[in-house]
Amino acid sequence: MNRRTAEVERYTLETQIRVQVDLDGTGKGKFRSGVHFLDHMLDQVARHGCMDLEVEAKGDLHIDAHHTVEDIGIALGQAFAKALGDKRGIHRYGHAYVPLDEALSRVVIDFSGRSGLFYEVEFPRDRIGDFEVDLFVEFFRGFVNHAQATLHIDNLKGLNAHHVAETIFKAFGRAVRAAVERDARTAGVLPSTKGLL
């Protein structure tokens, strides 16, 4: 069975991004984005998504992290679209609930071919260290627009901003893992009655 891998390079006047993904990996990650808290979250995605993921980025961090975070989401979405190909034989849908102490989040994803982000997260503060938490929505929007996926992210409980972020990214990894997993019973079959995703 072919491994589902992809490499994407995205170069703009604001950022230079390289992403490698192996959807059939073991959870290994290597991250050098210059945005340390995002690297920590991407490591959660790789580990809990059981995918191998490498991200290298150089961005205009002297301004802020916005372009770098958003463009990593875009490149990751492009890599997923490339690795999944025509999506034959995958489950297509995935969901996960993840707790961390007082925090609890739910993520549901559909690799439907239709892009949509439905993000209901209230952080108890604006920053985690020097990371602006409103950049998470830019990351996920970039991802769904280029992976052509519908993504629902709901934080159900949480008092600690770091815990909230971790539950979101761990649940995202686990939901993605479930959705892209191959289903032996439907090998070679497109998971849609429409005949196209």
From Swiss-Prot:
It catalyses: D-erythro-1-(imidazol-4-yl)glycerol 3-phosphate = 3-(imidazol-4-yl)-2-oxopropyl phosphate + H2O. Pfam families: IGPD (PF00475). It comes from the Bacteria. GO terms for molecular function: imidazoleglycerol-phosphate dehydratase activity. It is found in: Cytoplasm. Its EC number is 4.2.1.19. InterPro entries: IGPD_sf, ImidazoleglycerolP_deHydtase, ImidazoleglycerP_deHydtase_CS, Ribosomal_Su5_D2-typ_SF. GO terms for biological process: L-histidine biosynthetic process. Keywords: Amino-acid biosynthesis, Cytoplasm, Histidine biosynthesis, Lyase. Belongs to the imidazoleglycerol-phosphate dehydratase family. This is Imidazoleglycerol-phosphate dehydratase. The lineage of its organism: Bacteria, Pseudomonadati, Pseudomonadota, Gammaproteobacteria, Methylococcales.
